[in-house]
């Protein structure tokens, strides 16, 4: 401490000796250091504005001020006014006029906070006019302009008490510039910007002639308490008004937005919902474990009671009771439907060619509607509901403010470039990333200039289209040149000029001389982007060549805090005007973007060794979606081909090599596929007639889906026909009819359930999904109808061909000498009968299976609670898309989120004082105004998702009107008398301000408001008036023809939004904020009750659906269960137990699917919702056939009926449902589109696997325990039919093979179970007929 004090004394002595021999020998109260003006500073030239005159050296007593001089002093420097008789000053009238003029520039920025503005003025008033000037001012350098004249002061020292300086700085440190959404001190602190600014640096910048505004150099010394100065000098310690205090009765304190001390106590938003725990276990997990345990226990109890009940029944069974009325009712629907379809099938099989012709005519008639098809490719039209709130908001925004401009953006990182250190003269040692290398910047500048000068020929316009024809030009929208185009990049700090980029200069600072170059200028501009002239020896501007600042978060990315030199990526953004779809300029914009993409692809290839580049144009997303759709068409075609091949091969019943050509079902398989495709085309044509738009996704996916569903019915029908023996004397047509009567109710059950599920899925508001659901539902109905007609006719013709031993495909030839087919059951049926079913339904296996599936259900219930909701837009792209890298870079490097506009509708009066105060955020405004509420929200970005407070045209309009600035003036004479005079006009014709000076905040009258607002909106901002509204607010206020405001907007920024969950939550939070603002503004007198404030972000239309997709999904899926249960209940013969077990299996499939979606990275959204609706429909295929087979079986026990259903219908379901789905689904894994891979390949694979497991493993076990009792009505009918058949049995012997003894023509009796003694089939005792075909 002693050493420090000795050092201070030594410094004071040296300073005192230096002062003694310089220009201010007298330091005492009442003495000046300089007085009067001595012209311009000869050492300076090229200031940003006309620099003020410098003062004359004059160490003389202060002058007594009177008259006009006193009045001027009182107006300019009110704190130096001591009354009419006791006011002294060290400045002349000329000096006061110059001081007032020079302060007007800064006051334009600070006037919104009166305390700050007055404190700032007070500092410079004391320096220039204080009567005690010599106490704290010491001149250090003068120049002699002319002999005989007083020397002119070009440099001096000012000594302040540190507390005085820091209080003054503190009062200004939070004052904002609304248009730039930044702090005013950021442009008043030089290279340090707002982040590194403090009182010393703030004052140093004001005294630095290098800033282009200061007329002389001032060195500020801030002294701690107790530090003394020699020769009677005393540091200035004047009055400072805190920002939260007013200047007087008519003045207002600074607002919360400009002064932290003025802020009311804002309770922090509620913390993120804490996790729910029960003890140390997550609450949901604990609840699900309890639920699963109860479910398992209940199942065990039910099984036990059921087994015990069966044992009691077996002990008391003595006679066969007649079917009671409920059982007859249960049997009635089965009988009615069976007889109807049997009759129908017989008639169709009897007239196959007629039915085929009629079916073909109907399909063609409906397909003609495809000529009217409208394919939707616009992502907005595909993925957002036309009547959704977001679409309405978008329509309002586009109508009143124009569409959000089209963004063409480039991210660039350096390959194999390590970071390096740079010792900056201004900021000391700084780390620079590899991308910030001069040679790379030069190459990127060449790229940027090539893109800026890019031209492309338009055949429609018959001329070249260039960037200036379509670009967004905020400062010159009507007569745009190339340099007016908004291009944001780091290179704009050098005005896109190679020469300026290479510029170097020697600079001395604090006694150290060093070379400064582009790196110093970059550091300066990144910290102070509003700078018109940096403080380096380069003296370069930071303003882009189109006239606006480039903020660092839009030019560089991948940095921490404010370490911009460590940025890993450079960002180049071309902003292009957006136009309506029918505007010719939209085609021009897309044409230029196409050329932009080609240039970028070429540059990416040629510089792959230097740069890693990601880029995007506005048209890119739509282009890539369309590209992948076309690319994946062959994948879908192969999928259809494989399913067709499988059907063709699997439908055949092969017994001998010599009969392969005859027993093949290629034609029948092709016909089945044609039936499916015909149903799809007919459905699409039908909706085209109605004007319902379609999409490429429908063309891809719906045929595949309907083929998978339709192939199931084809298999079940054909296999049943092959297995069902022909009755004695039964014609082929009757045989087909009887087969159809047996399986058609089951086909109807599945098709109807699936179609209803799809139609319910159309309740979603997403257009693409809605159209997909409608088309799929109708296609399934048409598919069922065509299967009941065209396919039955095809089977009739194919059976006739096979029975005539004609080869498939080339049926014109006949093979008469072929041996008859062998009677055998087939490998699949054999496997199910001998191996699978006995193992599955073993007494020890069944409880294990039941327990495992219940545990799996419980586990997936928990996983279901953790599924992510949303759809990231990159999933709509192919895996090889260049946009994948773009979205990756966007999320990794962009340090700010998208802009969010708070739009106001008509019905609010902005022109009243109350109306303005409820909107603005400067002095005199309400504490909970619109902009203040957004400011409060921005202080909690993790909850509000707002990171940067809103710009406000109301605030800047008020500041623009302030008389102390040079912004709003009126011509007092000349040809433009009484018209607006721009701040660039310095003539004496513009001496009248728009508003008179007031003691309180400036507020225009209603008449003044409507008169001056258009002037403000068309005023170009410049150094003399930075508040001009042309650049920032030209499109922010929509005026009617009579000047009334019908819409306005206030722009803020979200925090970085990385995924769809962030976008969804940001939309939710901004709507809550807007609703709160709306409720507050409706309290302002004169406000329309329908007035509204709403948030608009360009992405809202895509993420609106995710606000409600969860409850909508639960409702839709729950709704799907109702018709599924009802249809099953009705078509299974009013069997409620079968319906419940059927529904239970479907619910378990659905829950397991959703749970495993979370494991496999499949998010929940509208696309997955429609697939889950499909899952309900497809689950019906897996379980309903087996449930119905169990219900109509006449075996005496549940276990035997379960075995019977598993062997016969289970094998058919495996061959017809699972095996027709698997090949097509697996092929989808090769699709390029991630949307197809994730939401159709993965999800449908899960659905098929889980459906297969539940249908062929879980359901038979459950039915063996809890299935319904045997239907005695069916038992009775079977008994009567058997007795009738035995009575009519012919006496002629049977042939050992189903062939005519003389001609050997094949007779299709189907598969005869009498050759398999192990199966006690009801039909095994039926006699055979020698009917030949």
From Swiss-Prot:
Keywords: Cell membrane, Cholesterol metabolism, Disulfide bond, Glycoprotein, Lipid metabolism, Membrane, Signal, Steroid metabolism, Sterol metabolism, Transmembrane, Transmembrane helix, Transport. Disruption phenotype: Mice have multiple lipid transport defects and have a protective effect against diet-induced hyperlipidemia. They have also a deregulation of CAV1 transport and localization, suggesting that the observed lipid transport defect may be the indirect result of an inability of cells to properly target and/or regulate CAV1 expression. GO terms for molecular function: lipid transporter activity; protein homodimerization activity. GO terms for cellular component: apical plasma membrane. Coiled coil: none annotated. The keyword GTP-binding does not apply. Expressed in small intestine, stomach and muscle, along with detectable expression in lung, heart, gall bladder, brain, testis, skin and liver. Expression in liver is extremely low. Highly glycosylated. InterPro entries: HMGCR/SNAP/NPC1-like_SSD (IPR053958), NPC1-like (IPR004765), NPC1_MLD (IPR053956), NPC1_N (IPR032190), SSD (IPR000731). Pfam families: NPC1_MLD, NPC1_N, Sterol-sensing. Residues 1-20 form the signal peptide. Its main location: membrane. Residues 306-352, 654-665, 718-742, 798-846, 1135-1142, 1187-1206, 1264-1333 are cytoplasmic. Induction: Cholesterol/cholate feeding resulted in down-regulation of intestinal expression. Expression is decreased by 35% in the jejunum upon PPARD activation. The keyword Cell membrane applies. It is a multi-pass membrane protein. The chain crosses the membrane at residues 285-305, 353-373, 633-653, 666-686, 697-717, 743-763, 777-797, 847-867, 1114-1134, 1143-1163, 1166-1186, 1207-1227, 1243-1263. Residues 632-797 form the SSD domain. It is found in: Apical cell membrane; Cell membrane. Belongs to the patched family. Plays a major role in cholesterol homeostasis. Critical for the uptake of cholesterol across the plasma membrane of the intestinal enterocyte. Involved in plant sterol absorption, it transports sitosterol, although at lower rates than cholesterol. May have a function in the transport of multiple lipids and their homeostasis, thereby influencing lipid metabolism regulation. May be involved in caveolin trafficking from the plasma membrane. Acts as a negative regulator of NPC2 and down-regulates its expression and secretion by inhibiting its maturation and accelerating its degradation. PANTHER family: NPC INTRACELLULAR CHOLESTEROL TRANSPORTER 1, NPC1-LIKE INTRACELLULAR CHOLESTEROL TRANSPORTER 1. Interacts with RAB11A, MYO5B and RAB11FIP2. Interaction with RAB11A, MYO5B and RAB11FIP2 is required for proper transport to the plasma membrane upon cholesterol depletion. Interacts with NPC2. Interacts with LIMA1. This is NPC1-like intracellular cholesterol transporter 1. The gene is Npc1l1.
């Amino acid at each position: 401490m002693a050493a420090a004090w000795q050092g201070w004394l030594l410094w004071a002595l040296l300073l005192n000796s230096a002062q003694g021999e310089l220009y201010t020998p007298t330091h005492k109260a009442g003495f000046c250091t300089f007085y009067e003006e001595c012209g311009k500073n000869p050492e300076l030239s090229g200031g940003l504005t006309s620099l003020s005159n410098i003062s004359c050296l004059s160490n003389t007593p202060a002058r007594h001020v009177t008259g006009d001089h006193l009045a001027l002093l009182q107006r300019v420097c009110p704190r130096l006014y001591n009354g009419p008789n006791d006011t002294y000053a060290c400045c002349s009238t000329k000096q006061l006029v110059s001081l007032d003029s020079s302060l007007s520039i800064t006051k334009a920025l600070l006037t919104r906070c009166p305390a700050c503005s007055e404190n700032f003025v007070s500092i410079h008033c004391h320096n220039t006019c204080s009567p005690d000037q010599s106490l704290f001012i010491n001149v250090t350098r003068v120049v002699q302009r002319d002999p005989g004249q007083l020397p002119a002061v070009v440099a001096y020292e000012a000594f302040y008490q540190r507390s005085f300086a820091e209080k003054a700085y503190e009062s200004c440190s939070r004052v904002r510039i609304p248009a730039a959404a930044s702090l005013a001190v950021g442009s008043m602190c030089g290279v340090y910007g707002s982040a590194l600014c403090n009182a010393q640096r703030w004052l140093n910048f004001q005294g630095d002639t290098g800033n282009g505004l200061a007329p002389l150099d001032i060195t500020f010394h801030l002294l701690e308490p107790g530090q003394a100065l020699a020769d009677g000098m005393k540091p200035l310690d004047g009055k400072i008004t805190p920002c939260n205090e007013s200047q007087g009765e008519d003045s207002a304190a600074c607002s919360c937005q400009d002064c932290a001390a003025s802020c009311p106590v804002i309770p922090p938003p509620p913390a993120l919902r804490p996790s729910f725990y029960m003890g140390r276990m997550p609450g949901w997990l604990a609840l699900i474990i309890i639920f699963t345990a109860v479910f398992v226990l209940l199942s065990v109890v039910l099984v036990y009671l059921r087994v015990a009940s069966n044992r009691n029944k077996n002990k008391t069974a003595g006679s066969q009771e007649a079917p009671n009325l409920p059982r007859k009712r249960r049997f009635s629907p089965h009988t009615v439907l069976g007889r109807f379809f049997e009759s129908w099938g017989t008639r169709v099989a009897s007239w196959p060619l007629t039915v085929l012709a009629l079916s073909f005519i109907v399909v063609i008639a409906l397909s003609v509607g495809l000529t009217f098809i409208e394919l939707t490719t616009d992502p907005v039209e595909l993925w957002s509901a036309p009547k959704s709130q977001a679409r309405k908001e978008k329509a309002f925004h586009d109508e009143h403010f124009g569409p959000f401009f089209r963004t063409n953006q480039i991210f660039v990182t350096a390959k194999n470039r390590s970071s390096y250190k740079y010792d900056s003269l201004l900021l000391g040692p700084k780390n620079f990333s590899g991308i910030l290398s001069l040679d790379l910047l030069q190459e990127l500048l060449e790229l940027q200039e090539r893109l800026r000068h890019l031209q492309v020929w338009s055949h429609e316009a018959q001329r070249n289209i260039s960037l200036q024809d379509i670009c967004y030009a905020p400062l010159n929208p009507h007569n745009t040149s190339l340099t007016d185009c908004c291009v944001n990049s780091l290179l704009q700090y050098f005005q896109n000029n190679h020469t300026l980029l290479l510029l170097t200069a020697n600079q001395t600072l604090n006694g150290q001389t060093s070379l400064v170059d582009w790196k110093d200028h970059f550091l300066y501009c990144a910290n102070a982007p509003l700078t018109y002239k940096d403080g380096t020896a380069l003296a370069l501007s930071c303003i882009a060549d189109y006239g606006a600042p480039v903020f660092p978060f839009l030019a560089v990315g991948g940095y921490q805090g404010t370490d911009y030199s460590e940025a890993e990526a450079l960002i180049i953004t071309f902003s292009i005007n957006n136009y309506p779809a029918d505007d010719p300029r939209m085609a021009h914009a897309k044409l230029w973007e196409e050329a932009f993409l080609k240039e970028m692809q070429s540059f990416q290839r040629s510089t792959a060794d230097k740069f890693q580049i990601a880029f995007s144009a506005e048209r890119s997303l739509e282009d890539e979606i369309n590209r992948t759709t076309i690319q994946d068409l062959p994948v879908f075609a192969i999928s259809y081909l494989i399913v067709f091949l499988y059907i063709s091969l699997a439908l055949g019943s092969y017994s001998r090599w010599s009969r392969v050509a005859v027993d093949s079902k290629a034609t029948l398989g092709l016909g089945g596929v044609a039936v499916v495709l015909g149903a799809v085309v007919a459905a699409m044509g039908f909706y085209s007639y109605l004007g319902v738009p379609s999409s490429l996704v429908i063309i891809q996916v719906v045929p595949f889906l309907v083929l998978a569903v339709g192939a199931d019915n084809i298999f079940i029908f054909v296999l049943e026909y092959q297995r069902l023996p022909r009755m004695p004397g039964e014609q082929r047509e009757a045989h087909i009819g009887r087969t159809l009567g047996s399986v058609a109710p089951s086909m109807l059950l599945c098709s109807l359930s699936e179609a209803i599920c799809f139609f319910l899925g159309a309740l979603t508001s997403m257009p693409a999904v809605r159209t997909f659901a409608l088309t799929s539902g109708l296609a399934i109905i048409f598919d069922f109808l065509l299967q009941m007609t065209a396919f039955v006719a095809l089977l009739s013709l194919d059976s006739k061909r096979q029975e005539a031993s004609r080869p498939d495909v080339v049926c014109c030839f006949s093979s008469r000498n072929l041996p008859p087919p062998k009677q055998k059951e087939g490998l699949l049926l054999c496997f199910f009968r001998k191996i699978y079913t006995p193992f599955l339904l073993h007494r020890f296996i069944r409880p294990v299976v039941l327990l495992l599936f219940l545990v799996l259900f419980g586990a997936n219930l928990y996983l279901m609670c953790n599924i992510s909701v949303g759809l990231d837009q990159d999933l709509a792209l192919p895996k090889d898309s260049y946009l994948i890298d773009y979205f990756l870079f966007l999320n990794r490097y962009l340090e700010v989120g998208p802009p969010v506009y708070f739009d106001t509708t008509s019905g609010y009066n902005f022109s009243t004082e109350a109306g303005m105060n409820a909107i603005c955020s400067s002095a005199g405004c309400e504490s909970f105004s619109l902009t203040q509420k957004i400011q409060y929200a921005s202080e909690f970005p993790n909850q509000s998702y707002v990171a940067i407070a809103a710009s406000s045209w109301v605030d800047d309009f008020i500041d623009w009107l302030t008389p102390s600035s040079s912004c709003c003036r009126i011509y007092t004479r000349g040809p433009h008398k009484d018209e607006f005079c721009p701040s660039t006009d310095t003539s004496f014709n513009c001496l009248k301000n728009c508003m008179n000076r007031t003691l309180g905040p400036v507020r225009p009258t209603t008449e003044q408001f409507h008169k001056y607002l258009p002037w403000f909106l068309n005023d170009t901002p410049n150094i003399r008036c930075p508040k001009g509204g042309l650049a920032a607010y030209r499109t922010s206020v929509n005026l009617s023809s009579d000047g009334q405001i019908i819409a306005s907007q206030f722009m803020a920024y979200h925090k970085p939004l990385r995924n769809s969950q962030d976008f969804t939550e940001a939309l939710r939070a901004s709507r809550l904020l807007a609703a709160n603002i709306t409720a507050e503004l409706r309290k302002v007198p004169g406000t329309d009750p329908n007035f509204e404030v709403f948030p608009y972000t360009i992405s809202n239309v895509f993420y609106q659906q995710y606000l409600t997709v969860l409850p909508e999904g639960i409702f839709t899926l729950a709704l799907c269960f109702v018709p599924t249960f009802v249809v099953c209940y009705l078509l299974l013969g009013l069997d409620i137990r079968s319906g419940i077990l059927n529904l239970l299996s479907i619910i378990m499939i659905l829950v397991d699917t959703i749970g495993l979606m979370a494991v496999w990275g499949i998010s929940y959204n509208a696309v997955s919702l429609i697939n889950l609706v499909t899952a309900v429909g497809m689950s019906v295929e897996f379980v309903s056939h087996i449930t119905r087979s169990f219900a109509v079986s006449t075996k005496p026990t549940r276990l035997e009926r379960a075995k019977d259903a598993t062997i016969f219908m289970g094998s058919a379901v495996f061959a017809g449902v699972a095996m027709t789905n698997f090949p097509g689904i697996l092929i989808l894994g090769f699709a390029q589109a991630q949307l197809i891979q994730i939401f159709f390949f993965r999800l449908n694979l899960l659905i098929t696997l889980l459906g297969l497991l539940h249908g062929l493993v879980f359901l038979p076990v459950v039915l063996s325990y809890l299935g319904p009792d045997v239907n005695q009505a069916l038992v009775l009918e079977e008994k009567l039919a058997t007795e009738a058949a035995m009575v009519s049995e012919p006496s002629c012997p049977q042939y050992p093979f189903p062939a005519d003894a003389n001609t050997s023509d094949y007779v299709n009796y189907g598969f005869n179970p009498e050759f398999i003694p192990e199966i006690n089939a009801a039909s095994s005792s039926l006699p055979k007929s020698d009917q030949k075909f």
